[in-house]
């Protein structure tokens, strides 16, 4: 009888130790989720501040080129974000930004723009 209770206590203790070990283990999925949430919020803010091409004066080559380049870099950032965070709230706009980025890249080349923005390169 004592052996029987000893085995139960040992099994219970083992279960508790396993549960503690699992609770203390690092959780990369949660960390990744937090990074994705933070980046999604940052992207939302950045998107609201993007310069619009239709507002740029068409005759001002420098402003048009910088506007195009800014939006191209944003499209790359969005693409990189969606590659890391496919369940992002921005996923539904991913295809639109990919097309927009391609169109702006073509316009950037047609206008013979030169890259002027340093820093983020996606």
Predicted regions: what is each one?
Residues 32-122:
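Post-signal/leader-peptide non-cytosolic segments of secretory proteins
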Residues 21-23:
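Residues within alpha-helical transmembrane segments of multi-pass membrane proteins, especially transporters
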Residues 18-19, 29:
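Cleavable N-terminal signal peptides
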Residues 7-10, 30, 72:
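Intrinsically disordered, low-complexity segments enriched in glycine/proline and serine/threonine
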Residues 2-16:
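Bacterial N-terminal signal peptides that target proteins for export
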């Amino acid at each position: 009888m004592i052996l029987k209770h000893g085995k139960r206590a040992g099994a219970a203790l083992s279960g508790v130790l396993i549960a503690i070990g699992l609770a203390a283990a690092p959780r990369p999925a949660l960390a990744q989720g937090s990074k994705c949430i933070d980046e999604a919020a940052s992207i939302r803010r950045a998107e609201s501040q993007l310069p619009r091409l239709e507002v740029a004066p068409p005759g001002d080559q420098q402003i048009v080129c910088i506007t195009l380049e800014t939006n191209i870099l944003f499209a790359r950032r969005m693409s990189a974000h969606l590659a890391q965070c496919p369940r992002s709230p921005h996923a539904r706009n991913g295809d639109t930004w990919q097309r927009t980025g391609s169109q702006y890249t073509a316009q950037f080349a047609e206008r013979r723009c030169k890259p002027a923005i340093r820093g983020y390169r996606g």
